[in-house]
Design a protein with these regions (language model features):
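Glycine-rich beta->alpha junctions and the first turn(s) of the following alpha-helix
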Residues: 217-302
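Glycine-rich, charged/polar anion/phosphate-binding loops
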Residues: 170, 189, 214-219, 262
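Glycine-rich phosphate/cofactor-binding loops in nucleotide/flavin-utilizing enzymes
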Residues: 4-6, 353-397
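Generic structural signal for well-ordered, non-transmembrane alpha-helical segments
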Residues: 33, 274, 295-305, 309, ...
Length: 397
C-alpha cells in the first residue's frame, strides 16, 4: 500500500469520529505525538505571550517538516492532514498557528520547484532535506503585510557584488522574527551597473551579519507569533541561494506563486477556524443557551472545514494546485464570514460572566477577526474574482 493510500485510510478513520475537533486532535497526535498535549498544558494567555514556549514546542515536535515528503526526512503529511493539524494548533495556540502558516507558506514555493526537478539530489531537495533533518524554521519575507501589494511583490533589493548579491530591505510584520533559522524573501535584482535583472526568491540565513530585529507588533492579540520588523542591510547572499522568478513582480501570478497562494489561503483559513473552534468548544461544554443555538455555531465551523478539506482532497488526488487558486480564495471568504458569525454567537452564548471572568473569550473573539486582514483583501478583489469566475486568470492584489 502506498503512503498516500495509507494516509487516506487514516484520514477516513479519524473523520469517522463525530465529536467536535476529534479528527483534528487524532491527526495531530498521530503525526506529531505530544505537541497537542504540551500546548494544552499551558493557559491560553501564556501561549499567546511574547515569552510563549509554543514555537519551540512546534520545532521540537518536527511540525516544521509537515509538508516535506518522508523520503526527505519530513513528516510527509497529505494536504488534508496538514489542514487538520493547522486547525488543531489554532484551537490551542492562535499565535503559533499564524507563525506555522507563514513557515509553511515559505516552503510551498521551494517544494513546488523541487517537484519540477527529476533529480532526487537537486539543490532544492537537498535544502528541504536539510530543513527537515535540522528542524529549521523559515520566516516569510514576502509582501503579505502590505495593503494593496501583491502577495509576492518584492520587499527587498539585491545588488550584484562580484559572484554574490547584497540584499537590503525590510519586512514588517515578519512572523518568527526571533526564532527563524532562515528567511525566504522576494527581491528585485540589480546588476553591477544598477540595471534591472529580474526578480528572485532569496534564501537567507538568520545568522548572517547585517540582519536586525526590532519591535513592531503593538496589537494586544497574536503577539506570540513574533511578528516584528526584520531589516536587512547589505546581507551577502550566495548566487545559488537566489531562486529566479523572471520579470514578474508578483502582481500577476505564475504557477510557482499560484501554488503559494493556494497553500497560504488554505492553511491560514484552517488556523482561524481553529481559533473559532476554541470558542465553539467552550459553548458546547459550558454554554447557557439551547441545543439549537449550540449546534448552529458548530455547523458554521464544520461546514467551512469540510469546504477546506474538499480542496485538500483535490490536491491529494493529484489535481494541479494551480487550478485551485480561485476555489481556495472563495472558500476562504466563505469561511471568513462563517467564523465571524460563529465567534459572535459563541461570545453571546457563553454569557457575560464568562467574558468577564476570563480573558480567553474576548481574546479568541478578537483574534478571529484578523483573518480579514490577510491577502487578498476582499474589498479590492471583487472585479478580479468576477473575471476569474468568467474564465480569466486570477490576479491577486
Amino acid at each position: 500500500m502506498s503512503d498516500t493510500k495509507q494516509a487516506t485510510g487514516a484520514e477516513q478513520a479519524e473523520r469517522a469520529g463525530e465529536a467536535f475537533l476529534e479528527a483534528e486532535r487524532k491527526t495531530i497526535d498521530r503525526l506529531l505525538p505530544g505537541l497537542d498535549e504540551r500546548l494544552a498544558g499551558h493557559p491560553l494567555e501564556e501561549l499567546e505571550s511574547r515569552e510563549s514556549p509554543a514555537i519551540e514546542y512546534f520545532r521540537e515536535s518536527g511540525a516544521s517538516n509537515i509538508l516535506i515528503p518522508s523520503e526527505y526526512d519530513g513528516v510527509g503529511a497529505t494536504a488534508v492532514e496538514a489542514l487538520r493539524v493547522q486547525r488543531a494548533i489554532g484551537s490551542r495556540a492562535p499565535s503559533l498557528a499564524i507563525a506555522a502558516t507563514m513557515h509553511s507558506f515559505s516552503l510551498a514555493g521551494l517544494l513546488a520547484l523541487a517537484a519540477e526537478t527529476e533529480e532526487k539530489d537537486s539543490v532544492e531537495w537537498m535544502l528541504l532535506q536539510g530543513l527537515a533533518q535540522n528542524k529549521l524554521l523559515v520566516a516569510s519575507g514576502f509582501a503579505e503585510g502590505k495593503s494593496g501589494q501583491g502577495l509576492f511583490a518584492p520587499t527587498m533589493r539585491a545588488r550584484r557584488d562580484g559572484e554574490n548579491w547584497l540584499l537590503s530591505g525590510s519586512k514588517k510584520p515578519c512572523s518568527l522574527a526571533y526564532s527563524m533559522d532562515l528567511m525566504a524573501t522576494s527581491c528585485a535584482m540589480e546588476g553591477d551597473g544598477g540595471e534591472f535583472e529580474g526578480y528572485a526568491i532569496a534564501v537567507v540565513s538568520s545568522q548572517l551579519p547585517g540582519i536586525e530585529v526590532e519591535p513592531f507588533w503593538s496589537a494586544p492579540v497574536l503577539t506570540g507569533a513574533q511578528s516584528e520588523c526584520v531589516t536587512l542591510r547589505d546581507v551577502e547572499i550566495h548566487d545559488e541561494l537566489m531562486i529566479r522568478m523572471g520579470e514578474d513582480d508578483g502582481t500577476g501570478l505564475d504557477d510557482l506563486q499560484t501554488i503559494g497562494v493556494v497553500w497560504f489561503e488554505l492553511l491560514m483559513t484552517a488556523s482561524y477556524l481553529g481559533m473559532a473552534s476554541a470558542l465553539v468548544e467552550r459553548v458546547l461544554k459550558e454554554g447557557k443557551s439551547d441545543a439549537n443555538s449550540k449546534v448552529q455555531v458548530a455547523y458554521e465551523i464544520e461546514a467551512s472545514m469540510a469546504a477546506l478539506e474538499s480542496v485538500g482532497h483535490e490536491i491529494d488526488g493529484g489535481r494541479n494546485v494551480v487550478e485551485l487558486a480561485l476555489r481556495s480564495v472563495l472558500v476562504r471568504y466563505a469561511a471568513q464570514d462563517a467564523i465571524a458569525r460563529a465567534a459572535a454567537s459563541s461570545v453571546e452564548q457563553l454569557g457575560g460572566m464568562a467574558f468577564i471572568g476570563s480573558r480567553d473569550v474576548g481574546y479568541l473573539a478578537a483574534a478571529t477577526r484578523a483573518l480579514a486582514f490577510h491577502p487578498p483583501p476582499r474589498l479590492r478583489s471583487g472585479d478580479a474574482l468576477l473575471e476569474a469566475l468568467h474564465g480569466a486568470e486570477l490576479a491577486v492584489a
